[in-house]
UniProtKB/Swiss-Prot annotation:
The keyword Glycoprotein does not apply. One of its GO terms (cellular component) is cytoplasm. It comes from Candida albicans (strain SC5314 / ATCC MYA-2876) (Yeast). This is Phospho-2-dehydro-3-deoxyheptonate aldolase, tyrosine-inhibited. Stereospecific condensation of phosphoenolpyruvate (PEP) and D-erythrose-4-phosphate (E4P) giving rise to 3-deoxy-D-arabino-heptulosonate-7-phosphate (DAHP). It holds the Pfam family DAHP_synth_1. Pathway: Metabolic intermediate biosynthesis; chorismate biosynthesis; chorismate from D-erythrose 4-phosphate and phosphoenolpyruvate: step 1/7. Inhibited by tyrosine. GO terms for biological process: amino acid biosynthetic process; aromatic amino acid family biosynthetic process; chorismate biosynthetic process. Belongs to the class-I DAHP synthase family. It comes from the Eukaryota. It catalyses: D-erythrose 4-phosphate + phosphoenolpyruvate + H2O = 7-phospho-2-dehydro-3-deoxy-D-arabino-heptonate + phosphate. Its EC number is 2.5.1.54. InterPro entries: Aldolase_TIM, DAHP1/KDSA, DAHP_synth_1.
Length: 370
């Protein structure tokens, strides 16, 4: 009888190599979260949670570049945003979108962590260090709360102490790993509806993440461990549209509220993403989405607790730099991933949203007095 031949190499046959990765605890030791950072982070988390629980009538705004590819530009944007946030603080809790990783439909630049020099050098250890320093500067020097997407289950160990908000993208909302991750994070998490525009997976995700879980994870010392969580009661749904559909209008919000009412937790709140499929992937349509949301809020809608906006110093987007040229070949303040609205348009949009919150507040006062 012939035997099946045993290959000389049968494990890791498609792995080209392994390189040492700096442990989260070491990076946190090198770049510590200052008292100033922690004050900003904790306040951002508290304010967001109070809005989600209905104890604060302001709106949350997650606004900033689609992805960060140059820390100095991000700091300049952050300084502008901080000034605006202070001006509108009575109506809006503004959290800077500080995304370090990008999910790709196929392939492409994966973000500041994966390729910090935008030259295919993939110096991930350098990317981690640059990113943590940026988060430290944004929260301590600039004084802004920040948020990011939870794309994998390891990177939060490096940065979660700086975050006041997290999002789970449409491609990963259905992932059990990401639901387990969300159940243990110390800040509010928004789950985007599926890429088809349906709410079911996001509703399931919010409810699953509110419960405790046991799963395999990695400690801050870089050791594999069994992780036990208690559940996250500050999760919500982000309406981002779907293939060939939008879901930010009055009827879509009404349908979402009806779906939520049938859940075990009817208090789940909604945030509207002004970009992605709601803008039909054209950044110039983001103000139109914001206009609709502002009108709904002005009319008393209180299930919408905030918006997401992709914004940069200058509008639009630009192609990746030619091979070998790095970031030096790029235009200043322009996205290299999704198109963004300009700073000037951002100011107009947030001012309009602030006015809508004021109108809703006045409307409620009138109802109480009557």
């Amino acid at each position: 009888m012939s035997k099946t031949p045993v290959p000389t190499e049968y494990d890791d046959t498609r792995i080209l190599g392994y390189d040492p990765l700096v442990p989260p605890a070491l990076l946190q030791h090198e770049i510590k979260a200052s008292a100033e950072s922690l004050d900003v982070v904790i306040k951002g988390r508290y304010d967001s949670a109070q809005i989600l629980k209905g104890n604060d009538d302001r709106c949350i705004v997650i606004v900033g570049p689609c992805s960060i590819h140059d820390p100095p530009q991000a700091l300049e944007y952050g300084k502008r945003l901080k000034k605006l946030a202070d001006e509108l603080k009575d109506d809006l809790v503004i959290i800077m979108r500080a995304y370090l990783e990008k999910p790709r439909t196929t392939v492409g630049w994966k973000g500041l962590i994966n390729d910090p020099d935008v030259d295919n050098s993939f110096d991930i250890n350098r990317g981690l260090k640059i990113s943590r320093q940026l988060y430290s500067d944004l929260t301590s020097v600039v004084g802004l709360p920040i948020g990011s997407e939870m794309l994998d289950t390891i990177s939060p160990q490096y940065f979660s102490d700086f975050l006041s908000f997290g999002a789970i993208g449409a491609r990963t909302t259905e992932s059990q790993l990401h639901r387990e991750l969300a159940s243990g994070l110390s800040f509010p998490i928004g789950f985007k509806n599926g890429t088809d525009g349906g709410l079911a997976v996001a509703l399931d995700a919010v409810q699953a993440s509110s419960k405790g879980h046991h799963f395999m994870g990695v400690t801050k010392n870089g050791m594999a461990a069994i992780t036990t969580t208690k559940g996250n009661d500050c999760c919500f749904i982000i309406l981002r549209g779907g293939k060939k559909i939008t879901n930010y209008d009055v009827e879509s919000v009404k349908a979402a509220k009806e779906a939520i009412a049938k859940c075990t937790d009817p208090s789940i709140k909604l945030m509207v993403d002004c970009s992605h499929d709601n803008s039909r992937k054209d950044y110039r349509n983001q103000p139109q989405v914001l206009d609709s949301v502002a009108e709904q809020i002005s009319n008393g809608e209180d299930s919408i607790i905030g918006v997401m906006i992709e914004s940069n110093i200058h509008e639009g987007k630009q192609p990746m730099p030619p091979a070998g040229s790095g970031k030096e070949a790029l235009k200043y303040g322009v996205s290299i991933t999704d198109g963004c609205v300009s700073w000037e348009t951002t100011v107009e949009m947030l001012t309009k949203l602030s006015q809508a919150v004021q109108t809703r507040r006045s409307l409620k006062k009138q109802k109480v007095s009557n």
